[in-house]
């Protein structure tokens, strides 16, 4: 039986990476789409922003776990997985700004919030769109 070192190697004889990567592949695009809607519909942000934020945090953790398990998984593979590994290294850094901007946008759109003027809100929306699209592209490239 192949066993990679560390806590991210194997579970019950199965490599963890293929199992963990599915949460990132599902959650990051889902969160990115939610973030895109949040950036243009404050009412959506008020109603669903907290859920999107929670999912974004779970997605961020899943991207990190997929990265860590991928490192352990590469130790047991014979073939070269260099490009995939390189992209996996930077994936958490690409998705993190989206999480921060979702939090900021949600806080701005909450009832009674006085955070940010119109220009700041629009710039936040633009940054959220860019970071969401970057996260989508990164997840599909990895």
Predicted stretch roles:
Residues 1-142:
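Polytopic transmembrane helical bundles with strong interfacial aromatic enrichment
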């Amino acid at each position: 039986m192949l066993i990679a070192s560390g806590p991210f190697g194997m579970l019950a004889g199965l490599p963890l990476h293929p199992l963990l990567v599915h949460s990132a592949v599902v959650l990051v695009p889902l969160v990115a789409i939610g973030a895109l809607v949040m950036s243009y519909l404050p009412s959506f942000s008020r109603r669903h922003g907290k859920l999107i934020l929670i999912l974004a945090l779970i997605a961020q953790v899943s991207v990190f776990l997929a990265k860590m398990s991928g490192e352990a998984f590469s130790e047991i593979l014979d073939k070269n997985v260099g490009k995939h590994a390189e992209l996996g290294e930077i994936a958490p850094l690409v998705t993190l700004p989206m999480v921060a901007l979702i939090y900021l946008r949600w806080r701005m759109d909450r009832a009674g919030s006085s955070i940010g003027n119109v220009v700041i809100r629009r710039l936040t929306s633009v940054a959220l769109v860019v970071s969401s699209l970057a996260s989508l592209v990164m997840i599909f490239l990895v």
